[in-house]
Regions:
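Predominantly a Rossmann-like dinucleotide-binding segment in NAD(P)-dependent oxidoreductases
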Residues: 1-85, 139, 231
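Short arginine-rich
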Residues: 220-230
Length: 235
C-alpha cells in the first residue's frame, strides 16, 4: 500500500479512512478478574485515554505510515458507552493531513461482535486501495475505469514492489501477517544495529518504528482528548 501511494499509482491522495472496531469491552469486564481489561480502563495505569490510547494510536500510525503524510490537526468526539467506565471506549476523529489530505478515524471497543477488524482505505485522483487486518495477505487496488485488482502477498509474486517483497516470507497462498510483521520489525532493527556497528549505510527498504512514532502517538492521544473536551480543532 505504501509503495503504491509513494509511486503515484493512484494519483495525488485526497482522502483516507481507517477504522478499528473491537467488541471485547462491550460489558464491564474490568469489574471481574480480566487483567487486560482492568489496566486498560484504569487512568492511573493507562493514562488519560482508553480506546484511543489502546488502538487509536495504531490507527493513526497506519494513516501516517501508509500515506507518508503527517496529521497536522484533528477534531474528535470520544464516548463512554458502558456505565461506570472511567475512560472512553469509543470515538471518532476528523483528520487533516499534509498536502490537503482529509481523513476519518474510528475506533471502538464496544462494537459488539467484532474481533479485531482494523481496515484502511485511501483514495487518490486516479484510484484507491483497501486493506484489512483480518485478511492481511490481500490488498485491493481500485483504479479509475478499471476492474478492481486483488494483489496478494508472496515472495513469488513478481508484480509486488521491492519493498513488499522484502517483507514477504512465504510463497503465495501461505498465510502470513500479524506474527510475521513483528518479525520483520525485529529483523529490520537488527539490520540497522549491524550496519551501524559496521559503518554501513542503512537500506531504507528495511524500516521500523522509532521513538518519533511513539512521540507522535502520545501527541495524538493528547490532541484527541483535548479536542473532545473543548469541542474544537487541535493542531
Amino acid at each position: 500500500a505504501r509503495s503504491i501511494i509513494s509511486e503515484g499509482k493512484i494519483g495525488k491522495i485526497r482522502k483516507v479512512a481507517v477504522e478499528y472496531p473491537q467488541g471485547w469491552l462491550s460489558t464491564m469486564l474490568e469489574k471481574g478478574d480480566n487483567k487486560q481489561a482492568s489496566w486498560r480502563t484504569d487512568p492511573s495505569k493507562s493514562g488519560k485515554a482508553g480506546s484511543m490510547g489502546d488502538i487509536g494510536t495504531h490507527a493513526a500510525n497506519m494513516v501516517e505510515y501508509v500515506t507518508g503524510k503527517k496529521i497536522i490537526k484533528l477534531f474528535s468526539k470520544v464516548n463512554v458507552f458502558v456505565d461506570g467506565r472511567m475512560l472512553e471506549d469509543d470515538g471518532n476523529v476528523l483528520l487533516s493531513l499534509e498536502d490537503n489530505i482529509e481523513g476519518n478515524l474510528m475506533t471502538s471497543q464496544i462494537a459488539t461482535g467484532e474481533e479485531n477488524d482494523l481496515k484502511v482505505r485511501v483514495w487518490g485522483e486516479g484510484g484507491g486501495i483497501e486493506w484489512k487486518h483480518s485478511d492481511p495477505n490481500s490488498l485491493i487496488l481500485k483504479l479509475s475505469n478499471s476492474p478492481n485488482q486483488l494483489l496478494r502477498a508472496g515472495v513469488d509474486n513478481s508484480y509486488l514492489s521491492d519493498f513488499a517483497l522484502a517483507h514477504c516470507r512465504t510463497p503465495s497462498g501461505h498465510p502470513e501477517g500479524f506474527i510475521e510483521a513483528f518479525a520483520n520489525i525485529y529483523r529490520n532493527f537488527a539490520f540497522s544495529v549491524s550496519n551501524y556497528r559496521n559503518n554501513k549505510k542503512n537500506d531504507t527498504i528495511y524500516d521500523y518504528p522509532t521513538v518519533q512514532e511513539g512521540y507522535r502517538g502520545m501527541k495524538f492521544i493528547d490532541a484527541v482528548i483535548e479536542s473532545s473536551e473543548k469541542c474544537k480543532w487541535i493542531k
